[in-house]
Amino acid sequence: MAEEEKTELPSAKKIQKAREEGNVPKSMEVVGVLGLLAGLISIFVFFIWWVDGFSEMYRHVLKDFSLDFSKESVQELFNQLAKDTFLLLLPILIILVVVAFLSNVLQFGWLFAPKVIEPKFSKINPINGVKNLFSLKKLLDGSLITLKVFLAFFLGFFIFSLFLGELNHAALLNLQGQLLWFKNKALWLISSLLFLFFVLAFIDLAIKRRQYTNSLKMTKQEVKDEYKQQEGNPEIKAKIRQMMLKNATNKMMQEIPKANVVVTNPTHYAVALKFDEEHPVPVVVAKGTDYLAIRIKGIAREHDIEIIENKTLARELYRDVKLNAAIPEELFEAVAIVFAQVAKLEQERQKQKIIKPL
């Protein structure tokens, strides 16, 4: 039997399971370009501080070398240089780590997936490694890198060619003017390349998300199986609902003998009302249409409960009043008329009982 094609979008459950396994749509191009931007901004912000710091280190080196040139002093000097260099570069390292973390959070949200670090044979299986090496995903990644290098080279060459026409003019400027000219052109080149890298990064992110969705697609049978797992077998649920409805109906039928009157349509609706000391307002103890209406009337006859025909009231009671709920105020008058009819019929019945022996 041929394998069924995966045409259905992944369910929320499958996406959540993939997230728990650390499988999320992620573009390293986005991480890289945001890191590059953060690095350039950091260089601009910390440049003067670094110049002062490295200048102080240089003066310190010259001073120590002039005083002592022993092995111990050289070792101590290099240790101090390494420490000072690390402290000078620490801010940008922290910034790059934070930006890398946030760039991942922006792509797929907060995620803690311990399963990622669990050992799996598939991760070290050389056959799987070879398959992944020649997969469509790797081909697209390689194509994007090639395109990125080509476009960056072309853009850089194009901008540099524009600068060539200004070199003669720049050569006539003083040193300060030349430095300013070089700074402006460098900013232009860097801004252009950053814009290109941002565009390519978001293209890569769109591709990664599409690949991710396609990799999680499901067959129609998988969708059905998952629905059964989450919601239960529809056939079993239908049987359970049927049994619950049957039990509720049987319980309702047991309340009919306690009713005072049944209001009918006369054929399609039947509503049983109860009115006693415990219920100062009449309560609907049973209601139904068609077959249920016939059953309600049948039980009412068996227990000598009056059946009053009132088409409008029967429909309103069935439609507007829930089971075991008191009737609303707007129906008080109509229901009172019905109970008056019941009382009148009861009086007539009592009179007939008294007259019969005579």
Curated annotation (Swiss-Prot):
Biological process, per Gene Ontology: bacterial-type flagellum assembly; protein secretion
Subcellular location: Cell inner membrane
Keyword Ligase: no
Membrane topology: Multi-pass membrane protein
Top-rank taxon: Bacteria
One Pfam family linked to the record: Bac_export_2
InterPro entries referenced in this protein's UniProt entry, alphabetically: FlhB, T3SS_substrate_exporter, T3SS_substrate_exporter_C
Transmembrane annotation, as ranges: 31-51, 86-106, 144-164, 187-207, 323-343
GO CC annotation terms, alphabetical: plasma membrane
Keywords from the UniProt entry: Bacterial flagellum biogenesis, Bacterial flagellum protein export, Cell inner membrane, Cell membrane, Membrane, Protein transport, Transmembrane, Transmembrane helix, Transport
Function: Required for formation of the rod structure in the basal body of the flagellar apparatus. Together with FliI and FliH, may constitute the export apparatus of flagellin.
PANTHER family attached to this UniProt entry: FLAGELLAR BIOSYNTHETIC PROTEIN FLHB (PTHR30531:SF12)
Family: Belongs to the type III secretion exporter family.
NCBIfam families: flhB
Protein name, UniProt field: Flagellar biosynthetic protein FlhB
Source organism: Helicobacter pylori (strain ATCC 700392 / 26695)
